[in-house]
Amino acid sequence: MAKEELVEFGGKVSEVLPDNRFRVILENGFEVWAYSSGRLKKNRIRVLAGDRVTLEMSPYDLTKGRINYRHKS
């Protein structure tokens, strides 16, 4: 998939799940499943419940996303 086809959303992590997955509530109120991007894993950036994040999602499946940025609090 080309990077131009991804849709970006902002949200807040509501729950941390096993295996580096998260439940995120988007700014529009929807709740989605998300996982950490490779860059976050490589740099050991911890994502905790309550953190504001930016997600990349495929326009074909808006129930799952990839966290690509954790905003500074």
Curated annotation (Swiss-Prot):
Chain segments annotated as transmembrane: none
Cellular component per GO, a single term: cytosol
Predominant place of localization: cytoplasm
Keywords of the record: Cytoplasm, Initiation factor, Plasmid, Protein biosynthesis, RNA-binding, rRNA-binding
InterPro entries: NA-bd_OB-fold (IPR012340), RNA-binding_domain_S1_IF1 (IPR006196), TIF_IF1 (IPR004368)
Residue ranges occupied by any S1-like domain in the UniProt entry: 1-72
CDD domains per the UniProt record, alphabetical: S1_IF1 (cd04451)
MF (Gene Ontology): ribosome binding; rRNA binding; translation initiation factor activity
Record SUPFAM superfamilies: Nucleic acid-binding proteins
Locations listed in the record: Cytoplasm
Coiled-coil region(s): none
Tree of life domain: Bacteria
PROSITE patterns, A to Z: S1_IF1_TYPE
Known function: One of the essential components for the initiation of protein synthesis. Stabilizes the binding of IF-2 and IF-3 on the 30S subunit to which N-formylmethionyl-tRNA(fMet) subsequently binds. Helps modulate mRNA selection, yielding the 30S pre-initiation complex (PIC). Upon addition of the 50S ribosomal subunit IF-1, IF-2 and IF-3 are released leaving the mature 70S translation initiation complex.
Membership in a protein family: Belongs to the IF-1 family.
Subunit structure: Component of the 30S ribosomal translation pre-initiation complex which assembles on the 30S ribosome in the order IF-2 and IF-3, IF-1 and N-formylmethionyl-tRNA(fMet); mRNA recruitment can occur at any time during PIC assembly.
UniProt name for this protein: Translation initiation factor IF-1 3
Taxonomic source organism: Cupriavidus metallidurans (strain ATCC 43123 / DSM 2839 / NBRC 102507 / CH34) (Ralstonia metallidurans)
